């Protein structure tokens, strides 16, 4: 299966992606992990771009995300399926992902949208207190609100695209981790 988790930061995408990855025994491809890996390990232009993201609190530019994902989608561990978290974030990224998945004879089976309020996203992110690789606080209230504003601008188009394709499944992301996982597994079982 090829599954995408979509939703604002703090909606629980990473938690659910990792749970589902373990349950289905397929890799979780986490956008943030890719960025952190390049920020830590890459000494070139891509590493610099990823490190800058943590300093500014902005997203990685589409062109740079495309490079990261192009390399990741070629790796053989995803041949039997995957769970994606944190990508795509906008319609250009959706189209890029579609093109790459077609090239590798794969396609999305389900897109889970974890729906949470802005207030809940902010609460969770502040509680998490995520730090950048350099140790500085990445999740300040101002940075969080700015990222959520940018996310909201793109959300409607992305959801419309996946809904039109019949792939979108909306999950109440304000439930417990276990309740969300149970809802997801209930949907997954219909595809087996």
Predicted feature locations:
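Glycine-rich phosphate-binding loop of ATP-dependent small-molecule kinases
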Residues: 1-192
């Amino acid at each position: 299966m090829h599954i995408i988790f979509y939703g604002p930061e703090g909606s629980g995408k990473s938690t659910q992606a990792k749970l589902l990855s373990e349950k289905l025994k397929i890799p979780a491809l986490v956008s943030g992990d890719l960025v952190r890996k390049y920020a830590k390990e890459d000494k070139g232009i891509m590493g610099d771009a990823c490190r800058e993201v943590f300093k500014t609190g902005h997203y990685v530019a589409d062109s740079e995300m495309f490079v990261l994902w192009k390399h990741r989608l070629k790796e053989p561990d995803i041949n039997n399926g995957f769970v994606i978290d944190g990508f795509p974030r906008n319609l250009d990224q959706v189209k890029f992902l579609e093109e790459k998945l077609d090239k590798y004879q794969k396609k999305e089976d389900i897109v889970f949208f974890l729906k949470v309020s802005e207030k809940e996203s902010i609460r969770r992110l502040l509680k998490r207190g995520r730090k950048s690789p350099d140790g500085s606080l990445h999740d300040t209230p101002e940075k969080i609100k700015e990222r959520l504003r940018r996310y909201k601008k793109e959300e409607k188009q992305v959801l419309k695209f996946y809904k039109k394709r019949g792939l979108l499944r909306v999950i109440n992301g304000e439930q417990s981790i276990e309740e969300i996982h149970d809802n997801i597994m209930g949907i997954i079982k219909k595809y087996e």
